Every structure is written in C-alpha cells, then in structure tokens.
C-alpha cells in the first residue's frame, strides 16, 4: 500500500528564478499541483519535510495550503545538478478511488542455483493501481532458479490490486545466468591438468 504523507504548504503568486532562490534560502521549495484541465495550484513547501518525503517511491501526498487540501502524487522532481538539492516539484492531483499508471522499481530476492546470478534487465516496471495502493517496489523471487532462466513481465507476481501495464508482456525483467568469469574459473583446473602431465616427462629427462 502507498505511503501517505501530509505536507503543510502555502499558496504562492510570485514566479521566476529570483523568487525560487529566495524561497530556497528560506528553506522552502516551490511546487506546482496539476489537475487535468483545471488551473494548476502553485504552492511552497517546507524543504526538509518535502526532501525526506520524496525518498518514498510512489507515495500519496495530502497537501494542505491556505484552507485547501489536495491529494496528489509526484509527477517530476527537478534537482540542482551540482548540489543535488531539490529546486522544484511537480505534483499530479488525484481523486480517491482513481487508478493511475506508475513506474515501480524492480528488486530481486532469493538465491539462484549453483553459481548463477540474477541480473535485472529493466529497472522499473509499469503498472496500474489505485492511488491508495501504489507499490513502492516490485520484488521478483529468483530462489532456486537455474542458469538461463528468464522472468518475463507477464510472469511477475504483483501485489493484490496491482495490474501489469506494459506494451510487451514478453519483455524480460530478470535473467538468471552464470557469469562468464565464473564459468572460466570453474573450467580452469581441468584445463591445467594436461599441462601438468606434460611437464612430467620433461622433468624425467633431466
């Protein structure tokens, strides 16, 4: 289930880089809440609380400002490329019971058989879910899977109420295989045996 976070903000009517700089000096972040065909709402949010809140993937926000309350999800986050501080946040207003499409990070758990290793082929999987049930991550189990096994999008077990929403259900999400260096190190002792045998006559000849 999505993490629900409440933020207390203020409406803003001034715009521009100079205004944004002044807000950041005051430990505030400018943000915009978009709402379909309606006029967007322009707000300022507390920097520390907002920065911490944005660590949660696909969180559901309740943003209160000047007597208004809007429920929203993050649409885009702009960061300073050098300082890595948040400069602006775009939100998308949502309604209770609404289903939306989101990109969810993929993680693996479990241990494949033998020397096989799990490789994540796509970092995020697109799914559709109720705004109150947005997953923070998709976990793919690779426990006991053998070399050469692929887990396709259609095979991923999703949380209850979450639907797959990708163009190609046959797309590989995780691949299990033995790395080349592991194969070579396993074969190396066998390859060295004939060389050791060949050295014996040379030693006898001395």
Curated annotation (Swiss-Prot):
One of its GO terms (cellular component) is cytosolic large ribosomal subunit. One of its GO terms (molecular function) is structural constituent of ribosome. Keywords: Ribonucleoprotein, Ribosomal protein, RNA-binding, rRNA-binding. SUPFAM superfamilies: Ribosomal protein L25-like. Gene3D superfamilies: Ribosomal protein L25, beta domain, Ribosomal Protein L25, Chain P. Residues 184-206 have a biased composition (Low complexity). NCBIfam families: bL25_bact_ctc (TIGR00731), PRK05618.2-1 (NF004131). This is one of the proteins that binds to the 5S RNA in the ribosome where it forms part of the central protuberance. This is Large ribosomal subunit protein bL25. It comes from Bifidobacterium longum (strain NCC 2705).
């Amino acid at each position: 289930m999505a993490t629900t976070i409440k933020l207390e903000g203020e409406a803003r009517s001034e715009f521009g880089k100079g205004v944004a700089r002044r807000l950041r000096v005051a430990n505030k972040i400018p943000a915009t809440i978009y709402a379909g065909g309606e006029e967007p709402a322009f707000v300022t949010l507390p920097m520390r609380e907002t920065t911490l809140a944005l660590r949660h993937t696909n969180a559901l926000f309740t943003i209160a400002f000047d007597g208004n309350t809007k429920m929203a999800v993050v649409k885009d986050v702009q960061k300073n490329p050098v300082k890595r501080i948040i400069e602006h946040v775009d939100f998308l207003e949502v309604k209770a019971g609404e289903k939306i499409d989101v990109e969810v990070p993929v993680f693996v758990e479990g241990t494949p058989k033998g020397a096989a290793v799990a490789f994540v082929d796509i970092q995020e999987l697109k799914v559709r879910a109720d705004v109150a049930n947005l997953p923070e991550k998709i976990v793919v189990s690779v426990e006991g899977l053998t070399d050469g096994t692929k887990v396709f999008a259609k095979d991923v077990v999703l949380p209850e109420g979450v639907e797959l929403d990708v163009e190609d259900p046959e797309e590989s999400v995780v691949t299990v295989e033995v790395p080349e260096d592991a194969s070579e190190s396993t074969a190396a002792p066998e390859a060295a045996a004939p060389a050791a045998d060949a050295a014996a006559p040379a030693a006898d000849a001395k």
